[in-house]
Amino acid sequence: WMSLLPDGRYLSELNIPGTHDSATANVEGSWNASYNKVACQKYFIEQQLYAGVRALDLRTRWHGDDMVMVHGDFICHTPDHNNRSKNKTFRSVLDTVIEYLDKHPSEAVIVTLKIDSGDEDKGRLALVNILNEYTANYPNRFYCWTETAFPNTLVAAQNRMTSPTLGQARGKIVLMTRVDMSGAGESSLYSYTGPDLTKWDDSYKDRNHYAQRIESESKVAVYIQDDYSSPDGNKKKQVFNTVYQLNGTYTLPGALKIEKKDFVFNYTSKTGSDHYGSTPLGAAKYMNDLIYNDDLFTPGSKTAKENPRLGIVVMDFVNKQLCRRIVFRQNTPLDDLIHRRGGQA
């Protein structure tokens, strides 16, 4: 769907469907998602990409001799079931995204990366090695946040970063990391790891009902609304107010003005619902219904026209219909593209 959008628009300006805990479609103990507290997705990552998802939330940890995908302490598995499934590795996810971009170079995929559990020192070292390997082997598949990739300290790289246009990001993984990599000394890898999001967890408790900027040295601002323990009505207010903040529609006391070059992650996900039970699936039933039915997310509605920007809408249990609600809010004739691809975005 990005193929119909102009190169000159900032990637941060687009309305982008994203997934929370993207690798959890087959996770330890997820045989019944209704009762499971760690499964957050039905679609595997390749299916998400073909449904229109363009932002992935990847959680990983050191396990054995590799970095595996996890939700907390629970390991994610490959699509195979019964005794044939294997641990899902970070490398395999990168391979999946790169293969997708090889086939669809008009698209860009934002990836946020976090070590969710385990030995952080070993995990950090392993991630540095993996990312050095992949950015060296696939330099055209990773967005370089600085003008050129050369050895920098983390702070120096942060001060040289610029927000990408869609044209600059096409065909690339646009990486942002919640991992503290400052101990790597001078490294060209800092040109690829994006704005420093290590203070994410200092900002997620959005009790003021709007998105908050993550403190960092980066010249590219990143805002998040990610209160995952909020009651249903409060979470709805947080999601909606973040959209109003993005568009300057209402004056929200204390809320910072968001520029078009700024990235905004607006999480609809949470741990449970007052109405549908204390699981991510229960929360998704409540929040996803809002996206399906509310005028704010309805293409062409008066409210949508007054609030054209949604940011990166990060969801649990995403599907094609949810993605279309976000994608069609670009004020661009995307219907024809969807129909030509047989329903794939």
Per-range role (PLM):
Residues 1-55, 62-103, 107-108, 152, ...:
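Long, acidic (Asp/Glu-rich), low-complexity accessory segments flanking structured domains
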Residues 32-33, 82, 121-126, 186-187:
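Short, flexible/disordered intra-domain loops and linkers
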Residues 83, 132-149:
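Acidic, His- and aromatic-enriched active-site or binding-groove loops in soluble protein domains
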Residues 105-119:
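Active-site groove signature of glycoside hydrolases
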Residues 111, 175, 313:
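A residue-level signal for conserved active-site and pocket-lining positions in enzyme catalytic cores
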Residues 125-134, 186-196, 324-332:
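Short, aromatic/basic amphipathic alpha-helical patches
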Residues 143-303:
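Surface-exposed substrate-engagement region within the catalytic domains
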